[in-house]
């Protein structure tokens, strides 16, 4: 056993030395002849010499293309600018094709073109930013016609409708529960106006679908808003109505930022079918109208800082009802006590009969 173990150890050490020698031979490259090494070096040199101009031309190629593209862009930009000035810098024409004189006719030709172009784009920008008219609604109705005492301005998307998308139907709008009740209860008290930030092309058929009975008096769209800081703002001063009797309902406070105490900001409807916000809104606005509030801003100011104005109204209404019930209970209790004492007094001190 000892001899076999010694033989095994000798064999293992020999195998290790042989493996190490083989690995060393594989790691070092075989020696090359001097002429073979010189030939390889000359090939590498000629290859580098031939690749040098090609790499230089390839590096110069993109820069040349960039220069050409830059010159073309400049040429197109200059041509487009000249075309815009030529098109929008001419005089306006009437229906017969004759030029209409303006205040720039006495200027040099180039100055005329530039000033008319500037005026055109300035007016176009003003058209986008400002409402289409300083009086968006006609004058209130006069007798014998009936004009509701208040005006209710409603947003469409997020207040009355919720946009939904599905693979089967695509985009569609869901009606909020309580729309019919809201219109029926408030139409005798409020002049209902839909004032939405949507375009007329989108909103007109939607309004027809939510109001088949014609409770809505007027419709105003995005072009009637005032564009400020990226928001479409509804300017109450352009409605041709008394601001003291106008209530704006929207899901964005930025929509009535110019008159913050004329607005009620609701949370955007998420499409929940169990929603009851419009019923609460109807009760809130009906309470204002039936109490004959002269200036709605004095009421809405108390709810301006509330996160949920309708919930705050419900809590205050519940608290007032409890206080009223408590007052009536105390009054009933005191009246019963007075009645008891009066009956007791009449029994103890009966009145003498007159002869």
Swiss-Prot record:
Residues 25-61 are annotated as: Disordered. Keywords: Membrane, Mitochondrion, Mitochondrion inner membrane, Phosphoprotein, Protein transport, Transit peptide, Translocation, Transmembrane, Transmembrane helix, Transport. Residues 47-61 have a biased composition (Polar residues). GO terms for biological process: protein import into mitochondrial matrix. The keyword Metal-binding does not apply. It holds the Pfam family NIF. Residues 145-288 form the FCP1 homology domain. Residues 45-67 are mitochondrial matrix. The modification Phosphoserine is found at residue 343. The chain crosses the membrane at residues 68-88. GO terms for cellular component: TIM23 mitochondrial import inner membrane translocase complex. It is found in: Mitochondrion inner membrane. Residues 89-355 are mitochondrial intermembrane. InterPro entries: FCP1_dom, HAD-like_sf, HAD_sf, TIM50. It is a single-pass membrane protein. Residues 1-44 form a transit peptide. Belongs to the TIM50 family. Essential component of the TIM23 complex, a complex that mediates the translocation of transit peptide-containing proteins across the mitochondrial inner membrane. Has some phosphatase activity in vitro; however such activity may not be relevant in vivo. Component of the TIM23 complex at least composed of TIMM23, TIMM17 (TIMM17A or TIMM17B) and TIMM50; within this complex, directly interacts with TIMM23. The complex interacts with the TIMM44 component of the PAM complex and with DNAJC15. This is Mitochondrial import inner membrane translocase subunit TIM50. The gene is TIMM50.
